[in-house]
Amino acid sequence: MKPIILTLFTIFFLSTSSCIENEKKETKKTTQVNLSENKEIRVQLEPKNNSGAIGKLRFNESKGIVKLEAKFMNLSPGIHAIHLHEKADCSLPDGKSAGGHWNPTFNKHGKWGDENGYHKGDIGNFEVDENGNGRVTMETKEWCINCEDQTKNIVGKAVIVHQEADDFFSQPSGAAGSRIICGGIVQ
């Protein structure tokens, strides 16, 4: 009788441990998500108001940070303002088809990062050398490329360079003068 009980016990033990083993194998399946996905948009800017100026930009998003790298040529030497505007429409000769500054949070115009508020499109000023060349580089967590948060998504907006510097005070645009380069941020 003991051998039969021992045999039955052994069979039972082996069959239940096999089920436990299968159960463990099933729970080991996981889904991996690639969090380091990079997104990139390149923008060619065209002259407006007969400026003859041109430019190119690259927006790159990695790990929740958007980096802007821009290069401009044929501008007048001095300080110029750069902003993101509401619409990726540069069809009018004066660039006004791009609308006003991109301001999805309805803040006052101001200098980027100002605790009193600023538009998400208020990038700021940059210097142009005596040869007409200028560069802008910045990084921010306040933008995203083609995300669902419309207070951060830059796709569908326009990049505008103005003839003059932004005074960071005048409402709603900073008194930066005419629009001399425009390019739509599109995918």
Q: What is each stretch, according to the model?
A:
Residues 1-5, 21:
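Positively charged n-region of N-terminal signal peptides that target proteins for export
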Residues 15-18:
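C-terminal motif of bacterial Sec signal peptides marking the signal peptidase cleavage site
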